[in-house]
């Protein structure tokens, strides 16, 4: 069974996390590191995927900036989504072919991992035909957004954003994932109580490992993670 290195990065801005993903993905493609999972939160940020445009912003960009919300055009798939503290963001950096999976099966695996996390807390997570992500209440509200990129070498970046205790008012700023007529929710909103983020994160790790046949090995905390990068990538980040 292959092992999984897990990086707990804490609160980190989107562009920095994106740069870290790219560097680990290059190392993964070169065989310098194994499969890796980044777990983190972002400050208030709207990301626009390959199917999104500024038309999916419901307020002017200058207003967003004044409110401290960053807007980033990302290279992931999907539409617009909102990130903020209280949301667990997971970025798996996997060599897709080593898991014997095509992109569709990989996406279904991410969804299945989240569905199992929700089931642990008595919530019924669902798929909606033709859409990516995890929903509740018969598809009425999205609880987890998923958007990925797969490199020419078959290495995945980006991933999923599971709403745990996030302030849902931030989603009023966008058309979430470009889908009209459906709501957005969180685990705490559905359960009526604050949910322990650490518990959700640990269970998400366990279910991802079960679905993708991985063994969690090295757990790296925010203050230590650069030491685990290949030297060339570590030196570059030190110069930032």
UniProtKB/Swiss-Prot annotation:
Disulfide bonds: none annotated. It comes from the Bacteria. Residues 31-216 form the BPL/LPL catalytic domain. Its EC number is 2.3.1.181. Its main location: cytoplasm. InterPro entries: aa-tRNA-synth_II/BPL/LPL, BPL_LPL_catalytic, Octanoyltransferase, Octanoyltransferase_CS. The active site is at residue 177. This is Octanoyltransferase. PROSITE patterns: BPL_LPL_CATALYTIC (PS51733), LIPB (PS01313). The gene is lipB. In the reaction, the free carboxyl group of octanoic acid is attached via an amide linkage to the epsilon-amino group of a specific lysine residue of lipoyl domains of lipoate-dependent enzymes. It catalyses: octanoyl-[ACP] + L-lysyl-[protein] = N(6)-octanoyl-L-lysyl-[protein] + holo-[ACP] + H(+). The lineage of its organism: Bacteria, Bacillati, Chloroflexota, Chloroflexia, Chloroflexales.
């Amino acid at each position: 069974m292959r092992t999984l290195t897990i990086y707990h990065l804490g609160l980190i801005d989107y562009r920095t996390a994106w740069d870290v993903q790219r560097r680990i993905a290059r190392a993964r493609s070169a065989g310098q590191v194994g499969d890796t999972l980044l777990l983190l939160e972002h400050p208030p940020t709207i990301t626009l995927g390959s199917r999104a445009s500024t038309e999916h912003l419901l307020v002017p960009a200058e207003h967003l900036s004044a409110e401290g919300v960053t807007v980033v055009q990302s290279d992931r798939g999907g539409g617009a989504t909102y990130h903020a503290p209280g949301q667990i963001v997971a970025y798996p950096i996997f060599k897709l072919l080593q898991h014997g999976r095509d992109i569709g099966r990989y996406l279904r695996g991410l969804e299945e991992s989240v569905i199992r996390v929700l089931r642990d807390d008595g919530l019924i997570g669902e798929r909606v035909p033709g859409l990516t992500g995890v929903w509740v209440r018969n598809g009425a509200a999205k609880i987890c957004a998923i958007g990925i990129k797969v490199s020419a070498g078959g290495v995945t970046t980006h991933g999923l954003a599971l709403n745990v205790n996030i302030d849902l008012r931030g989603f009023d700023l966008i058309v979430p994932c470009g889908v009209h007529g459906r709501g957005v929710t969180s685990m705490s909103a559905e359960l009526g109580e604050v949910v322990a983020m650490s518990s959700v994160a640990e269970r998400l790790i366990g279910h991802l490992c079960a679905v993708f046949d991985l063994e969690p090995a090295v757990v790296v905390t925010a203050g230590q993670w650069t030491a685990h990068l290949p030297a060339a990538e570590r030196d570059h980040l030190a110069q930032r």
